[in-house]
């Protein structure tokens, strides 16, 4: 699959009620689940820091959309890896 490489809210646009992901300049094809987890960890961190008031609902909706693309099994695996990444010493836990 594709790892975006800079998955921030600045790289999403809304056009005619459809959300599009843009700016794939840092993207790469990868089969490593951890690469995808790093992408999700970044968007989660951005939601928490820049959009704290809507973080929980935004994260929930993001994961629903993610699941619709990758399937429940892969989404579950990646979310677990996000938690593992957050537990590493250099990352602060995000709600």
Residue ranges and their predicted role:
Residues 2-9, 14:
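Catalytic-loop of the protein kinase fold
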Residues 17:
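Conserved catalytic motifs of the protein kinase core domain
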Residues 20, 24-95:
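C-lobe/activation-segment region of protein kinase-like
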